[in-house]
Amino acid sequence: MNLRNKLKLYVITDRRLKPEVESVREALEGGATAIQMRIKNAPTREMYEIGKTLRQLTREYDALFFVDDRVDVALAVDADGVQLGPEDMPIEVAKEIAPNLIIGASVYSLEEALEAEKKGADYLGAGSVFPTKTKEDARVIGLEGLRKIVESVKIPVVAIGGINKDNAREVLKTGVDGIAVISAVMGAEDVRKATEELRKIVEEVLG
């Protein structure tokens, strides 16, 4: 499997905008190459049930499936990987518990990016590229900060934070392997169409 290729258009769920299952189905129809289930403060059983359904859907569309934060849920639903932030389980511990999971690390600076790569992350989610409503306290690194990270690490980098169809091109031109979006897809009236538009831009720039 070519991980870089599978990270091109990475769509993250947000139940404040849309229920998970239907929106993920539409995003996959629109060409999402990876899905991350991001559910904060839900019972583990609920996360497990939704995760199982999303795992099935992503398999049907040959997309990668990641779970945010929860290594246990990722293992239970047979996800491809887990996304870990600075306050989540340490990367090296997750690798020990779940050696077969693809580990993505959320990083907000060049220092954090280098540290995550050293600890064994398989790819980075780097941002926030622009200010974002989804995470109002996010540190903004801008296109320049993103470019520095891309130039300094060997592992794939996915850009995140305030990315939409209007700025996706300039983000992709920094050399990233893909873009991660929440509001640009989950906040759209037509999830499938919004995903298709972004996929078209991704293909134009990355091929």
Swiss-Prot record:
Keywords in alphabetical order: Magnesium, Metal-binding, Thiamine biosynthesis, Transferase
Residue sites binding 2-[(2R,5Z)-2-carboxy-4-methylthiazol-5(2H)-ylidene]ethyl phosphate per the record: T132, K133, T134, G162, I182, S183
Associated pathway: Cofactor biosynthesis; thiamine diphosphate biosynthesis; thiamine phosphate from 4-amino-2-methyl-5-diphosphomethylpyrimidine and 4-methyl-5-(2-phosphoethyl)-thiazole: step 1/1
Annotated EC: 2.5.1.3
Keyword Magnesium: yes
Cofactor field: Mg(2+)
CDD domains: TMP_TenI (cd00564)
Binding of Mg(2+), residues: D69, D88
Chain residues that bind 4-amino-2-methyl-5-(diphosphooxymethyl)pyrimidine: Q36, M37, R38, I39, K40, D68, S106, K135
Any one Gene Ontology BP term: thiamine biosynthetic process
Gene Ontology, cellular component aspect: cytoplasm
InterPro entries in the cross-refs: Aldolase_TIM, ThiamineP_synth_sf, ThiamineP_synth_TenI, TMP_synthase
Catalytic activity: 2-[(2R,5Z)-2-carboxy-4-methylthiazol-5(2H)-ylidene]ethyl phosphate + 4-amino-2-methyl-5-(diphosphooxymethyl)pyrimidine + 2 H(+) = thiamine phosphate + CO2 + diphosphate; 2-(2-carboxy-4-methylthiazol-5-yl)ethyl phosphate + 4-amino-2-methyl-5-(diphosphooxymethyl)pyrimidine + 2 H(+) = thiamine phosphate + CO2 + diphosphate; 4-methyl-5-(2-phosphooxyethyl)-thiazole + 4-amino-2-methyl-5-(diphosphooxymethyl)pyrimidine + H(+) = thiamine phosphate + diphosphate
GO molecular function annotation: magnesium ion binding; thiamine-phosphate diphosphorylase activity
Pfam family, one: TMP-TENI
Cofactor note: Binds 1 Mg(2+) ion per subunit.
NCBIfam families assigned: thiE (TIGR00693)
Family label: Belongs to the thiamine-phosphate synthase family.
Protein's job: Condenses 4-methyl-5-(beta-hydroxyethyl)thiazole monophosphate (THZ-P) and 2-methyl-4-amino-5-hydroxymethyl pyrimidine pyrophosphate (HMP-PP) to form thiamine monophosphate (TMP).
Protein name: Thiamine-phosphate synthase
Organism, as annotated: Pyrococcus furiosus (strain ATCC 43587 / DSM 3638 / JCM 8422 / Vc1)
Gene: thiE
